[in-house]
Amino acid sequence: MPFDRPSRQSYRQTVTVLSLEDLAASTPPGTPWLGLDLGEKTIGVAASDTTRMIASPLSLIRKTKFTDDAHAVLKLMDGRGASGLVIGLPLNMDGSEGPRAQSCRAFARNLQRIRAVPCAFQDERLSTSAVERFLIEELDLSRKRRANVVDRTAAAWILQGALDRIRVAEQT
C-alpha cells in the first residue's frame, strides 16, 4: 500500500472518525470490524464475526514505529475483510481525556493519512483491569500467561462493548 500523503485540504476530507452509530451505518453489512486496544508497547487486536454480534481476541502487535504498526493493522483488516475499526479510548474516570486518549486519537488521525479507514472510538475505562480480574479469578492464569493474552482480550472487550451498544441503539 503506497504512502500517498494527501494535501491538507484533501486530508480533512479523508478523515473518517465516526460515531459508533455512523460507523454501523456507513460500513457494508456482512463485514467484520476490528477492535484495537492501543497500549504503550503493544496493540491488542480483536475481530467481530460477520454479523457483528461477537468479538473475539485475534492478535497482538508489538509496537515498533508507527508506519509498521499501521501496516500491521491494515494487513489484518485486509486479511479479515474488515470494513471498520473500533479503537479503545482510555478516558479518565471523570470522562476527561488525558495523554493516553490523545495518543489514541493521534493514532487514528495518522492512520487516516495512510488509508481512509472508517473508525470510531469506544470508551475503554477499566477494560484492562476487568480483563485481568477475569483472567485471574475465573481462569486462574499466571502473570506470565496473562501478559500474553490481556491486550488482545481487552481489545475484544472494547469491541464487544461497541457491538452491544450498536445492537441496543438499533432496538430502540
Task: Map each language-model feature to its residues.
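Phosphate- and other anionic-substrate recognition elements at nucleic-acid/protein interfaces
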Residues: 3-6, 10-36, 41-172
